From Swiss-Prot:
Organism: Streptococcus pneumoniae (strain 70585)
Known role: Catalyzes the attachment of isoleucine to tRNA(Ile). As IleRS can inadvertently accommodate and process structurally similar amino acids such as valine, to avoid such errors it has two additional distinct tRNA(Ile)-dependent editing activities. One activity is designated as 'pretransfer' editing and involves the hydrolysis of activated Val-AMP. The other activity is designated 'posttransfer' editing and involves deacylation of mischarged Val-tRNA(Ile).
Domain of life, per lineage: Bacteria
The enzyme's E.C. designation: 6.1.1.5
Residues involved in L-isoleucyl-5'-AMP binding: 554
Cofactor binding note: Binds 1 zinc ion per subunit.
UniProt binding sites for Zn(2+): 888, 891, 908, 911
Annotated gene: ileS
Pfam families in alphabetical order: Anticodon_1, tRNA-synt_1, zf-FPG_IleRS
PROSITE patterns according to UniProt: AA_TRNA_LIGASE_I
Top-level class of the enzyme under EC nomenclature: ligase
Chain ranges for the short sequence motif 'KMSKS' region as given in the UniProt record: 595-599
UniProt-annotated location(s): Cytoplasm
HAMAP family (UniProt xref): Ile_tRNA_synth_type1
Protein name: Isoleucine--tRNA ligase
Length: 930
């Protein structure tokens, strides 16, 4: 036997290298085979519900790192709630209708207009489901736990029927109407868009300054006067029917030198406009308030059949332009509102493809709207005063990335204005985890217009509306419920398979159809109505869920998307928000803080992270960032997270190895019998337990990460485990001192593994497989530990906080001695402490082997003044010299009792007593040489 064999060197097969990329899929299959999700649900049956409702990602393409961050966050919450006394089911969902899928099929060569619509929709459905299953596998690879066999998908018959019923209730309450308001119109998609389908980019446009000649000045202005107008959309002049001024803005009538014409502009802008137009020696002839100009009539710049009326509008400002805007009610929301209020014609001169129509005039007909500037300039002639290129923020179709226009077309709307206050009141009852989130959603609802819910596309849920022979729209409770029942059995494709009369209740009649003939609506619903109905399609319809949900968690862009549409439909139907809490996240940016883009080549695919690091590192990264704001991710950042993971893993490996001979049922030492330092570490660990439990409850992942890493690096690695080897390796295997420390080790190991499970389930299960005395076969089936408190806890914490200060001062003294070449390692030191009453009281309270805690071979405590050569730090003085004696071959301390024993071992008296007591046979035979 060799002397080293008398040491209790921890042994474990738990590998230092995690091998996550190859091991994770194996563990995930094991969990699936063991039906862990179902078993967890069974364990939680009867407990209070916590329902996190999954906002459905769009079923197209592989998941990106933003998806990963969002879904890992959801998984951490679901797992932590499931292990904290809640019944927390997770039903993943997917959004499957809409234009992107039609665009994919078009790229694949599918010609929609050349094939049967039902067959086309079948192709859309097949493609959408293929994407659902692909993304499902992507999410499962992240280590997510959920009901993967009972997903919710917006194209299933039960979901579509639930959506129709949401629409029906809104129709019954009078919230659905048809109108010809201007809407966001995407010529590139040939469809109306909702606000949530718009994104803003900078666009360079030609702006024109031109003049309308006064035709009837109402006794205020003469007919040789021109009102100066500014526009950034020259094509809309073809539909201009008025000029809008601000009622309280001051306007001036001016005449520049050399001009026979007189002009009206905003007084505040006269100086800048004079410079822009090249006016000199401008004479101000009169000043008017905007309201004085109301109902003056001007000529259209070139259309002699059209007069343009001066009207008042609150949207007019003097921030730019001339303080006067031309008004085309068919091409703008503000224009429409003031135009309708003043009886202006709603003219639309652009078709669905962005092409100018015949009513724009023969010079314009057939031109693309954005190419008509030269023609407009030609038509304006000497009425054009200036033109310039401006860069401004402009709405784009979020899918095609093309600019859109406002365009008045007949559409179906949900009248938000009819129940706006009810929605705002509902927002006040929701808990927002970021106050700005509440303000943002509140302001969006307060300021938004009615919701355009119709789309001129094919792949979606049909609007369940019929038309009588006289054109009357039919959407009664009876007809809508009948359609819902048909969809429930056959799916929405039946709408296209059957004639209108076969979709109506048997024997249905309507006074507007004396011949019994009916037509059906061909528009489909906005996809935001699809996902915005999920509270009904999922929460209400599934018995293991609750409505409203406890939590909606999505990216901050969903304040204008899913949070918004779900809120509107839920309040419209039931008067309540569909969620009790909202937690939003920022976007994942690259390492430089730039937006990720395939064109920039700075994207990071979750699959690439899984191959290089493992999903576990991605999960840990999610907790290492403040996801309420935009966050950064790169392979370098993930490498740093991987290093943190390595430290966590190796620390826990040390605990596994050094409890391998510990049977908790037999070897645990009661708290009251622990040493002071062990009590301290137990208390500190329970503080960590409370911090982490509270942070899980509040969804504060970064708090968990910081607290965990700090505990492992500072409390364990830099202190407790730093001197632990002198106990667990050196002392007798069954000695009280060793068992005391092992008791703490094992308690920390078991509980920290449970605490890590929601974040690092793969690693936690791997550790758990080495804990043979734990009864649950999977740690995921256990409960999170409860934080304990102990007698005299605060007193113990205060004592050890003071000792940590003392220890820090001692370490400074040792470092100075090391720099002076007095010692090398701290174990070579003889440390003398010149104590005062404070230090004396402290060390008595610590009641531990202080030399062991400081990792020095010899410690002397002297009462009285320190010599001049002593090193003083704050109010403690030290001297450091090399310890006397020889190095013990067993404990590596320098000890004056170290000597060669009769059994061929050069060891100190303390080690000799341990060896002689526990290894009598080896002592009798003598130890082998090293």
């Amino acid at each position: 036997m060799k002397l080293k064999d008398t040491l209790n060197l921890g042994k474990t097969a738990f590998p230092m290298r995690a091998g996550l990329p190859t091991k994770e899929p194996v563990w995930q299959k094991e969990w699936e085979d063991a039906k862990l999700y179902q078993r967890r649900q069974e364990l939680n049956e009867g407990k209070p519900h916590f329902v996190l409702h999954d906002g459905p990602p769009y079923a197209n393409g592989n998941i990106h790192v933003g998806h990963a961050m969002n879904h890992i966050s959801k998984d951490i919450i679901i797992r932590s709630k499931s292990m904290s006394g809640f019944n927390a089911p997770y039903i993943p969902g997917w959004d499957t209708h809409g234009l992107p899928i039609e665009q994919v099929l078009a790229k694949q060569g599918v010609k929609r207009k050349e094939m049967d619509l039902v067959e086309y929709l079948k192709l859309c459905r097949e493609y959408a489901l293929s994407q659902v299953y692909k993304q499902r596998d992507d999410f499962k690879r992240l280590g997510m736990s959920g009901d993967w066999e009972n997903l919710y998908v917006t194209l299933t018959p039960d979901y579509e029927a639930a959506q129709i019923r949401v629409f029906g209730e809104m129709a019954n309450k009078g919230y659905i109407y048809r109108g010809a308001k201007p809407v966001y119109w995407s010529w590139s998609s040939e469809s109306a868009l909702a606000e949530a389908e718009i994104e803003y980019h900078d666009l360079v446009s030609t702006s024109l300054y031109y003049a309308n000649k006064v035709k009837d000045g109402k006794g205020i202005l003469d007919t040789d006067t021109y009102i100066v107008v500014w526009t950034t959309t020259p094509f809309t002049i073809t539909a201009s029917r008025g000029l809008t001024v601000g009622a309280d803005i001051d306007y001036v009538l001016v005449q520049p030198a050399g001009e026979t014409r007189k002009f009206v502009v905003a007084a505040e802008l006269l100086t800048s406009l004079s410079e822009k137009f090249g006016w000199a020696d401008v004479q101000v002839l009169a000043t008017y308030r905007g309201q004085e100009l109301n109902h003056i009539v001007t000529e259209h710049p070139w259309d002699t059949a059209v007069d343009e009326l001066v009207i008042l509008g609150d949207h007019v400002t003097t921030d730019s332009g001339t303080g006067i805007v031309h008004t085309a009610p068919g091409f703008g929301e503000d224009d429409y509102n003031v135009g309708i209020a003043n009886g202006l014609e709603v003219a639309v001169t652009v078709d669905e493809r962005g092409i100018m129509m015949a009513n724009a005039g023969p010079e314009f007909e057939g031109q693309f709207y954005d190419k008509v500037v030269p023609t407009v300039i030609e038509k304006l002639g000497n009425l054009l005063l200036a033109q310039e290129e401006i860069s401004h923020s402009y709405p784009f179709d979020w899918r095609t990335k093309k600019p859109i226009i406002w365009r008045a077309v007949p559409q179906w709307f949900a009248s938000v204005s009819k129940f706006r206050q009810e929605i705002l009141d509902a927002i006040d009852k929701v808990k927002f985890h970021t106050e700005w989130g509440k303000v943002r959603l509140y302001n969006m609802i307060r300021d938004r217009g009615d919701w355009v819910i119709s789309r001129q596309r094919a792949w979606g849920v049909p609007l369940p509306i019929f038309y009588a022979e006289d054109g009357t729209a039919i959407m009664t409770a009876e007809t809508i419920e009948h359609v819902a029942q048909l969809f429930e059995v056959h799916g929405s494709s039946i709408w296209w398979e059957r004639d209108a009369k076969d979709l109506l209740p048997e024997g249905f009649t309507h006074p507007g159809s004396p011949n019994g003939e009916f037509k059906k609506e061909t528009d489909i619903m906005d996809v935001w109505f699809d996902s915005g109905s999920s509270w009904n399609g999922v929460l209400v319809n599934r018995p293991n869920l609750t409505y409203p949900a406890d939590l909606y968690l999505e990216g901050s862009d969903q304040y204008r998307g899913w949070f918004n549409s779900s809120l509107i439909t839920s309040v419209a139907n039931h008067g309540v928000a569909p969620y009790k809490q909202i937690l939003s996240q920022g976007f994942a940016l690259d390492g430089k803080g730039e937006k990720m883009s395939k064109s920039l080549g700075n994207t990071i695919a979750p699959s690439d992270v899984e191959k290089q690091f493992g999903a576990e590192i991605l999960r840990l990264w999610v907790t290492s960032v403040d996801s309420s704001n935009d966050v950064r991710i790169s392979m370098d950042i993930l490498s740093q997270v991987s290093e943190t993971y390595r430290k966590i893993r190796n620390t826990l490996r040390f605990l596994i190895a050094n409890t391998s001979d510990f049977n908790p049922a037999q070897d645990t030492v009661a708290y009251d019998e622990l040493r002071s330092v062990d009590k301290y570490m137990t208390i500190r660990f329970n503080q960590l337990v409370k911090t982490i439990r509270d942070a899980y409850a509040d969804f504060e992942f970064l708090t968990i990460y910081k607290a965990l890493v700090n505990f492992i690096n500072v409390d364990l690695s830099a202190f407790y485990l730093d001197f632990a080897k002198d106990v667990v390796y050196i002392e007798g295997a069954k000695s009280l001192e060793r068992r005391q420390m092992q008791t703490v080790f094992y308690d920390i190991l078991v509980k920290i593994t449970k605490l890590l499970t929601p974040i690092l389930p793969h690693t936690a299960e791997e550790i758990w497989s080495y804990l043979e005395f734990e009864t649950e076969d999977f740690v995921q089936l256990s409960e999170l530990p409860e934080a304990q408190t102990f007698a005299n806890q605060e007193e113990i914490l205060d004592t050890w906080a003071a000792f940590m200060d003392f220890r820090g001062q001692a370490q400074k003294a040792l470092e100075e001695a090391r720099n002076a070449k007095v010692i090398g390692k701290s174990l070579e030191a003889h440390l003398t402490v010149y104590q005062n009453e404070v230090v004396k009281t402290l060390l008595e309270a610590v009641n531990s082997n202080v030399a062991q805690l400081l990792i020095v071979s010899e410690l002397t405590i002297v009462e009285g003044p320190a010599p001049e050569a002593a090193l003083s730090f704050e109010d403690v003085a030290f001297t450091v010299e090399r310890a006397t004696g020889e190095v013990c071959d067993r404990c590596r301390r320098i000890d004056p009792t170290t000597a060669e024993r009769s059994y061929q071992a050069v060891i100190c008296d303390h080690c000799a007593s341990i060896v002689e007591e526990n290894f009598a046979e080896a002592v009798a035979e003598g130890f082998e040489e090293k």
